[in-house]
């Protein structure tokens, strides 16, 4: 390590905790990127949720607000054997794979039973990445909304139903 730092040996104060909040909601695997001077954070609902949310901020370190549902991971996998994963995890954003107007995510899945990873029909389809392309994500904060009050971008799934 280099630079000025110190080991914290006491519980943070309420003020320090408030200062350190990136967002008010919990989640996992956050990814931050910049588009036209606004910073966006995408994050999986916690814990191991199927809902993927997007937030926005004026700064890369937050606070991120305006949580909006970006897309929901499917309940089943497009695979042989048992199509129901125990959970989706490790949502990753791939900016290098994203084209204009889209976001590309990958994620993995767990089987319900650890031993289903081996010598079962479709076992190779667990623990492999599944890719999702989200089109028109820039319009998620537009004022035109659907019946549920949220604008929904278009999602294309590669490897999942």
Segments predicted by a language model, with ranges:
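Carbohydrate-active catalytic/glycan-binding domains of CAZyme proteins
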Residues: 1-161
């Amino acid at each position: 390590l280099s630079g000025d730092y110190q080991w914290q040996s006491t519980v943070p104060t309420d003020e320090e905790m408030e200062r350190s909040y990136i967002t008010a909601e919990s989640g996992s695997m956050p990814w931050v990127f910049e588009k036209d001077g606004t910073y966006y954070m995408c994050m999986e609902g916690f814990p191991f949720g199927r809902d993927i949310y997007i937030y926005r901020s004026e700064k890369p370190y937050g606070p991120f607000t305006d949580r909006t549902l970006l897309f929901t991971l499917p309940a089943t996998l497009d695979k042989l054997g048992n199509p129901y994963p125990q959970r989706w995890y490790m949502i990753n954003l791939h900016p290098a794979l994203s084209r204009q107007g889209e976001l590309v995510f990958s994620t993995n899945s767990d089987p319900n039973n650890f031993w289903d990873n081996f010598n079962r029909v479709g076992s190779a389809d667990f623990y492999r990445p599944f890719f999702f392309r989200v089109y028109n994500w820039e319009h998620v904060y537009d004022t035109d909304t659907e019946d549920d009050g949220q604008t929904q971008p278009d999602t294309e799934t590669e490897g999942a139903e």
